[in-house]
Amino acid sequence: MVPGTSSLTQDLVRAINGEYSAIACYAKLAEKAPNQEIRKQILEIRQDEVRHYHIFSQIFSEITGTKPNPQITEECPTAYRVALKFAFQDEQHTVDFYLDVAEKTQDPFIKEQFKRAAADEQNHAVWFLWFLRV
């Protein structure tokens, strides 16, 4: 195992589980959206999370030689507005986490993937904040 991959592997497991949880949550959130415009945007955000999940899973498999075993680590609130606030806060925390991972890794590809995902997550947070005002 390459030095530093144990920490990276743990970070990838956390990222994979977070994306997996968000995918499930945003599907439920989209069903509760008050209109088609918001529903469509939430589903677009969900697609970004699916993409992140696949990228992080691929990196995990390349490093460990195994497939990840994703788990839902955070339950999605059932009330629409509570779930929006939860999603906003989660996206903000995820931005910080992904930027930390990008800073720690020496691998340019992995660094770039986490930076791109962090930028997406920041964009998602802005959308969820906007949805809270509608």
Question: Positions of the model-derived regions?
Answer:
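Non-heme di-metal
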Residues: M1-V134
